[in-house]
């Protein structure tokens, strides 16, 4: 790669980021981060009318159908929310479970969650590591307290983790809330931490309505044995990526990006080339006969 093609500029976002976004010689900006910062970047980019690609926050819904395979679904559901300590934009943070299996799903999720080993990230036996900083830890604990205050049932976790090897780091117990309603703060705002909200539904229409009742639309999912039914429901969820019976699956040939306040544009797939290129139309006339130029008759 020739010198200058790739440049790494480090520094605080408020300084380096602002300089890049507002500079006239920068014609395209791609950003991955919070919706709040994404909105600011979009507003700044308007000053020079530059293209932006924004991959922002999420509050991913996962609809659990009554016919799920518990043995495979339960651990995969937990991977969807607790991977990377929940610090993943597409994390499955809203689990929408049919009322007929709600209690058993919550019970099995809690039992499996209590087996997750917290520890240092470089330890191969670690199941979940710490969150990124003290401020993020305190923010997550604040959301957990708001869930308790609003009446959600704390099933497991909910505290800063302690124990051997956990004192040097910002560890939070993997947390599950049951009896969550979609108007609660923990169900509406991106927590970016190891917190799962379990909601209940009666009908398919209600499940889809809950899933789509969000400012976000980055990802979503459906769990169930009937793949045809799951695919049908997937088409009705307003999100850029939908997983069926799995989570966090990416391919370089499959586009990734969000609906609504989860972003603009797509990364990966053929679509990404349009995000980083401009379309040009070059029209060349090969005739020397004015008679073959009908527009001339409008002027002469």
Please tell me what each predicted stretch does:
Residues 13-16, 58, 202-204:
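Short helix-initiation/N-cap motifs at beta->coil->alpha
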Residues 14-15, 36-37, 47, 228-229, ...:
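Short alpha-helical
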Residues 17-18, 208:
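Short hydrophobic/charged patches on amphipathic alpha-helices used for structural packing
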Residues 22, 34-181, 244, 291-292, ...:
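ALDH superfamily catalytic-core signature
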Residues 26, 63, 117, 128-129, ...:
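Conserved C-terminal structural/oligomerization subdomain of aldehyde/semialdehyde dehydrogenase
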């Amino acid at each position: 790669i020739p010198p200058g093609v790739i440049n790494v500029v480090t520094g605080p976002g408020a300084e380096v980021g602002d300089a890049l976004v507002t500079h006239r010689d920068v014609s395209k900006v791609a950003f991955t981060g919070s919706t709040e910062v994404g909105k600011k970047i979009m507003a700044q980019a308007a000053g020079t009318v530059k293209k932006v690609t924004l991959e922002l926050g999420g509050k991913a819904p996962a609809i659990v159908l009554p016919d799920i395979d518990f043995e495979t679904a339960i651990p995969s559901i937990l991977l969807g929310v607790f991977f990377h300590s929940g610090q993943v934009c597409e994390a499955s943070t809203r689990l929408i479970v049919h009322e007929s299996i709600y209690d058993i799903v919550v019970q099995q999720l809690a039992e499996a969650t209590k087996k997750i080993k917290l520890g240092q990230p470089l330890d191969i036996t670690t199941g979940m590591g710490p969150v990124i900083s003290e401020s993020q830890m305190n923010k997550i604990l604040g959301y957990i307290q708001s869930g308790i205050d609003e009446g959600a049932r704390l099933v497991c976790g909910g505290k800063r983790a302690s124990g051997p090897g956990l004192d040097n780091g910002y560890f939070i117990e993997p947390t599950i809330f049951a009896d969550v309603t979609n108007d609660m703060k923990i169900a509406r705002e991106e927590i970016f931490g190891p917190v799962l909200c379990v909601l209940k539904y009666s009908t398919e229409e209600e499940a889809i309505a809950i899933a789509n009742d969000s400012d976000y639309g980055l990802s979503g999912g459906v769990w169930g044995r009937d793949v045809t039914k799951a695919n049908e429901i997937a088409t009705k969820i307003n999100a850029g990526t939908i997983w069926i019976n799995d989570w966090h699956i990416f391919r370089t040939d499959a586009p990734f990006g969000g609906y609504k306040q989860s972003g603009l544009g797509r990364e990966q797939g053929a679509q990404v080339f349009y995000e980083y290129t401009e379309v040009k139309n070059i029209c060349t006339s090969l005739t020397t006969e004015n008679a073959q130029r009908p527009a001339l008759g409008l002027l002469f």
